[in-house]
């Protein structure tokens, strides 16, 4: 389509929808035709390459005057995808499926076996290097990778979620947990209803991820696992690169090797893999490995580094002289990570890499989550609930075990991710003191009022009051309700004088004030409930 304009007796032809925004975007249908891919393969390719749809500012210009809703991509992104070698593998896999269907129809078992052995496979190494040119860029995107792979590590096998993907997710997450333990990089842990939140400082980058609680996972139909499986497939390759680099930085062998062999006569690969997954045994390091610290740093950076080193030393020595035994009902992985990060030893029943057993006399603490019978208790060890480990780690000091005994009502488990975590306990103590002081004051006032009443009665009995007719006087009392009504009426009159363009802003401010008052009231009620429960 074209139209023309006149400029000093010269006709200039202008083609509509062939320049500007109309050429910068391309619809998904045109992209599929250009790449000659199915919608399923196109989605996989976009996820792997990190290409996402975009919303144009002027849909009518891009869609050639039409207002129909469509999915748009940048044309340069589609041109970028056209040169991807994985597209050829997708086409080969399509041919493989066609040949496999023919062989199954003919019941040719040898042909089927040969096709399965030679089926096309693709590698994602070059895509990982392309999307993360530096190691720091990979660490910045590590949060999503860990959250997804920890979720896939406990999912049941299905047609979409293959056993190899679940096994790879479990292996890589266990390797990352070992790095967190060996490098003492864990900073915060918080247990919530959704799961367990972790925060660690990995090579200068803060990484936060969530791990679900240990429970059986049933069939979930509300989630599109085909999309998530593609993300997990990419993150598996990415985490392999990251784990290798992290293990090299702290002097560990990769793949990981245990520091000592178990007493059990199990030399097969599965037994070794189970011992690595248990997180109870340390890993072996390179010989003559020394941790390198950059000496060319300024004074300000040096002070920050000293604070971090002091914090790391506190964490290392927190459980240094303790041995823990975990009962069957408590979560193993999270407690093993925290205890071993703080220098302690941990073991449990049927632990693949157990260094000691339940009857060991050197055990100092036993973690239980249900009341024990007196006949089953050992006098030489302390019995505490799991929250004691979490709270002690977040406070960087071993707390008193009186509040964490089996069967006791636990204190509130505070989140270390909140900004007022350090001052919250001080506020709770102040509130307790204030509540006690207010209770004493009210009791004292009541007793004083009773004493005054009794004294007045005695005085009235002792004195003989003459009979005098006295009329009661009338006190002028202000009607508070009338005052409030007048103030409200004045406020409404002032609101009516607000211009129309300012009225919406005023209503937003008013709603915000009401919401803050309501939230403050709810928080105060919750705080009083927590104080009553703590007392």
UniProtKB/Swiss-Prot annotation:
Quote the Gene3D superfamilies the UniProt record gives. Answer: BRCT domain
Q: Which UniProt keywords apply?
A: Nucleus, Ribosome biogenesis, rRNA processing
Q: Which InterPro entries match?
A: BRCT_dom, BRCT_dom_sf, PES
Q: Where in the cell is it found?
A: Nucleus, Nucleolus; Nucleus, Nucleoplasm
Primary subcellular site in the record, as a coarse category: nucleus
GO cellular component annotations of the record = nucleoplasm; PeBoW complex; preribosome, large subunit precursor
Q: Which residues form the BRCT domain?
A: 314-406
Q: What does this protein do?
A: Required for maturation of ribosomal RNAs and formation of the large ribosomal subunit.
**Hey, which family's this protein in?**
Belongs to the pescadillo family.
- What this protein is called in its record is Pescadillo homolog
Q: Which organism is it from?
A: Brugia malayi (Filarial nematode worm)
Gene behind this protein: Bm13949
